[in-house]
Amino acid sequence: MLSLRPALRLLQAPLRCWAVPKAHVSAKPAETPTSPAEQAVGLSFIFITFLGPAGWILSHVENYKKRPRA
């Protein structure tokens, strides 16, 4: 049993609780506030980036189904 103790300690090491450092979160307002126009551009860009390709694929599903097999 004495020879298994170091191996057992190695296996239990990942199971021990790790001390997670505290995040440095600032409660101050932004130095340069984002204007409504910038927010609108950003939201539009995100919308187009994520939903644009999905919309393209969904609108062309019938074409993909009819594509001749090679």
From Swiss-Prot:
Bilayer topology term: Single-pass membrane protein
Pfam families the UniProt entry points to: COX8
Entry keyword annotation includes Ion transport: no
Classification via InterPro entries: Cyt_c_oxidase_su8, Cyt_c_oxidase_su8_sf
Subcellular location: Mitochondrion inner membrane
Residue ranges annotated as Mitochondrial matrix topological domain: 25-35
Any single GO CC term annotated in Swiss-Prot or TrEMBL for this entry: mitochondrial inner membrane
Main location: mitochondrion
CDD domains given in the database record: Cyt_c_Oxidase_VIII
Record has Transport as a keyword: no
Transit peptide interval: 1-24
Keywords: Membrane, Mitochondrion, Mitochondrion inner membrane, Transit peptide, Transmembrane, Transmembrane helix
GO biological process, any: mitochondrial electron transport, cytochrome c to oxygen
Membrane-spanning residues: 36-59
Family membership: Belongs to the cytochrome c oxidase VIII family.
Binding partners and assembly: Component of the cytochrome c oxidase (complex IV, CIV), a multisubunit enzyme composed of 14 subunits. The complex is composed of a catalytic core of 3 subunits MT-CO1, MT-CO2 and MT-CO3, encoded in the mitochondrial DNA, and 11 supernumerary subunits COX4I, COX5A, COX5B, COX6A, COX6B, COX6C, COX7A, COX7B, COX7C, COX8 and NDUFA4, which are encoded in the nuclear genome.
Job description of the protein: Component of the cytochrome c oxidase, the last enzyme in the mitochondrial electron transport chain which drives oxidative phosphorylation. The respiratory chain contains 3 multisubunit complexes succinate dehydrogenase (complex II, CII), ubiquinol-cytochrome c oxidoreductase (cytochrome b-c1 complex, complex III, CIII) and cytochrome c oxidase (complex IV, CIV), that cooperate to transfer electrons derived from NADH and succinate to molecular oxygen, creating an electrochemical gradient over the inner membrane that drives transmembrane transport and the ATP synthase.
Name this protein carries in UniProt: Cytochrome c oxidase subunit 8B, mitochondrial
Organism phylogeny: Eukaryota, Metazoa, Chordata, Craniata, Vertebrata
